[in-house]
Amino acid sequence: MATIDDVAKAAGVSTSTVSYVLSGKRPISAPTRARVERAIDKLGYRPHAGARALASSRTNVIALMAPLRVGVSVPVIMQFVAGVVTRARDFNHDVLLLTQDDVSGLDRVTGGSMVDALVMMDIEADDPRVPVAAAAKQPTVLIGLPQDPEGLSCVDLDFDAAGRLAVRHLVKAGHTDIALIGSPPEVLRRHTAFAERLMRGLRDQAKISGVTVKVEACDSTPTGASEAVDTLLATAPETTGIIVHNEGALPHVLARLAERGAVVGTDMSVVAVCPTDVALSQRIPMTSIDLPAEDIGKVAVDMVMARLESEQPSETRLLAPVLTERESSADGPAGPLD
Amino acid sequence: MATIDDVAKAAGVSTSTVSYVLSGKRPISAPTRARVERAIDKLGYRPHAGARALASSRTNVIALMAPLRVGVSVPVIMQFVAGVVTRARDFNHDVLLLTQDDVSGLDRVTGGSMVDALVMMDIEADDPRVPVAAAAKQPTVLIGLPQDPEGLSCVDLDFDAAGRLAVRHLVKAGHTDIALIGSPPEVLRRHTAFAERLMRGLRDQAKISGVTVKVEACDSTPTGASEAVDTLLATAPETTGIIVHNEGALPHVLARLAERGAVVGTDMSVVAVCPTDVALSQRIPMTSIDLPAEDIGKVAVDMVMARLESEQPSETRLLAPVLTERESSADGPAGPLD
DNA sequence: TATTAATGTCGAAGCGCTTCGACGAACCGG
DNA sequence: CCGGTTCGTCGAAGCGCTTCGACATTAATA
């Protein structure tokens, strides 16, 4: 491999000049720059990342912690990941992927200065990674909202507002008996932030609107979905509006409803909280509140890069939920409220 | 951040001694080692990855190219990824994730010595990345089989054998009219290796067994699956055995078959080629040939690490397919052949 | 007991890059 | 026409680590 000195020699300049051509941190005359550039691609020179990291204390790598936990939809995780990776490249950064949610990986990459910054997904209310990340010298952005962000920046869909929006939508259409088919029990047991926030929004709005909301946890399997639907139909047969917040279970919930004779979009209104592509690839185009996973990933990178470039106060960005009406919801027994 | 010199000073030894304690490359007496180790965790010392990379020309990072292409099942990709990441950690390596299939990313990370080795997924017959990887100084393992591996190691399920096995299984059960519902047209257009190999195996065995195999490409959408099923039933109504090689379409294929009145496991035998968990999470437990994605990922890492530790000739490892009978297949019109 | 071989530790020379201060040359206004 | 800028370039000092050769010690061998 050619080194910067080889390039300097070939171009007849000093190494620092080559470095400045590369970084643009000092003015270089056009002819010199041209000579250097010619030498660079004649030799096929690539700066050594480690040497660069050592000298500049910048790695141009960010870490992405994307725990592959049971109960969370893998395609949705990947949408976040894709957003992060894509946007990181726009900032000339690469992504180091950590799939275990252990704290050890975290301080390996931060302590060892392997990365310039951190993005962490799937944050729990009381996540052990948060204090560790807060103590690191690298800026961190959380996708999700812990109880105490400890000065870290956060970004997520405003699930609280999403919950309220979903209920309002159903109430406005005349539904008074509403249910949530939610995350798998494991997810709730972990106090995953987004699940709890949606439920809070739901309940708050239900109280305000004076309607009932029955909550049913649901495994992301055909069986789990069937059970959830069955117990719902058994314990709250008057239900006419269902909110589904579980990408994996959604198709099976719809299938079970069909088997049980409930016609979605007529007898039963269903609002999904999920990425748009998931909403559209069901048997019926679903009325849904979009979970803009890829965008959130991109915003996370934007935020973390901003903090890298200049000291900035931490901020929390909650994206406003957008509900799109499609064919899975209709007016309820009380008729449209206008 | 504490440096190795700080540790040396604190322990009253030279820096090289600290280094040798860390690497174990030279014998160090127990008391010295103890003093050094105490100093290390008193200071919270972490070696600087860049400095280490520069001095040792080892980064302890491997690159994983996992292009997120249309038509390939995201959960399946993630199983490969999970296998790679997990196993890499066993070798004390982290994973740099590249999701674009462009060659530029490839030589950024190899040329810049950002990684020690490479694992590339989703290999096409004539993949432009292959020659580039072959020219890199880092060892590379391909998950998939290009036309010309150019001295690189490869690992994959033996799709050729899988195709033959699937046909043999159906023929033995008395089916003579067999069909494949395969990958999406985009995947075939890209000449993705595994899709073509499965089809080759299928056809070879069909010729040998004297049966017909109708091949139907299939989008991984409800519509795509329905269309595939419909045209199959229209153009080859005598079909009694179907092989499905398309994780995304599988549930929709089964749904459509049900709608069309074909009882899977009785009228119609279906063999899936997919990961076991996918086979088990269908409406019926599917007879399937396992695609051991996570294992393949792990093997890829094992192979690449072996080449890293000692110069070894390249090898191609094709995992033997295993068919597990479950409830989606049964004897056909000609009855069991024994 | 003299000789050789481990064993344990140190010092110093890099690894390839960035960056700071310095310096000559060209350029400005007064 | 001269002091003060600005521009373009250079040299050298690190960044924090690994690793090689050297050098004492101590243990094993004859």
Model-identified regions with their sequence ranges:
Chain A
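N-terminal helix-turn-helix DNA-binding module of bacterial transcription factors
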Residues: 1-60, 333-338
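Alpha-helical recognition/docking segments in bacterial nutrient-uptake
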Residues: 2, 61-168, 234
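Short acidic/polar active-site loop segments enriched in Thr and Asp
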Residues: 14, 60, 116, 176-177, ...
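Short beta-strand segments enriched in small/hydrophobic residues
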Residues: 17-20, 57-70, 177-187
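Glycine-rich phosphate-binding loop signature in dinucleotide/nucleotide-binding domains
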Residues: 43, 173-175, 232-238
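Hinge/beta->alpha junction and helix N-cap segments in small-molecule ligand-binding domains
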Residues: 67-75, 100-103, 155-165, 181-228, ...
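Flexible loop/turn connectors
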Residues: 226, 235-338
